[in-house]
């Protein structure tokens, strides 16, 4: 029996990160967490490229462009969509999650969903590096594992 498991080694791998500027006080923390995880696992600065987009809705387009370039072993999508008083939250959260999943399937490049979808700012703050850990860090660890797993299964 053959068992495949992605290793947590970022050395020699290239990563693209797409970050939403909207709710930047949150997304900056997610980015810090992602960079921390990548570097702790051996990624070099020159193997990490970051693209800033205006909002979460724009993440899938740039993530797709990065994935289609085949320059990256994985792409990490970081953003924060916080529920307001209108249905806008639902539209953005749904489209971003569907878009990111579709890119991975279409390009066979792991595109990791690190977009917070929370009901309150407080929930977002907790998930961006306080009591709830840092979801950017977790997304980067997932990217490392998936990049290695994809290489292993080829």
From Swiss-Prot:
Spell out the Gene3D superfamilies in the cross-references: Lumazine/riboflavin synthase
Q: Name one Pfam family in it.
A: DMRL_synthase
Associated pathway: Cofactor biosynthesis; riboflavin biosynthesis; riboflavin from 2-hydroxy-3-oxobutyl phosphate and 5-amino-6-(D-ribitylamino)uracil: step 1/2
Active site located where?
88 (proton donor)
Has UniProt tagged this entry with the keyword Transferase? yes
- Report which reactions are catalysed by this protein: (2S)-2-hydroxy-3-oxobutyl phosphate + 5-amino-6-(D-ribitylamino)uracil = 6,7-dimethyl-8-(1-D-ribityl)lumazine + phosphate + 2 H2O + H(+)
Q: Which SUPFAM superfamilies match?
A: Lumazine synthase (SSF52121)
Write out the GO biological process terms. riboflavin biosynthetic process
Sorted UniProt keywords: Riboflavin biosynthesis, Transferase
Q: What class of enzyme is it?
A: transferase
Question: What cellular-component terms does GO give this entry?
Answer: cytosol; riboflavin synthase complex
| GO MF term (any one) | 6,7-dimethyl-8-ribityllumazine synthase activity
HAMAP family annotated for this entry?
Answer: Lumazine_synth
**Which purpose does this protein serve, as stated in its record?**
Catalyzes the formation of 6,7-dimethyl-8-ribityllumazine by condensation of 5-amino-6-(D-ribitylamino)uracil with 3,4-dihydroxy-2-butanone 4-phosphate. This is the penultimate step in the biosynthesis of riboflavin.
NCBIfam families xrefs? lumazine-synth, PRK00061.1-4
What family does this chain come from, according to its entry? Belongs to the DMRL synthase family.
Would you tell me the protein name for this molecule? 6,7-dimethyl-8-ribityllumazine synthase
Species per Swiss-Prot/TrEMBL record: Thermoanaerobacter sp. (strain X514)
Origin organism lineage: Bacteria, Bacillati, Bacillota, Clostridia, Thermoanaerobacterales
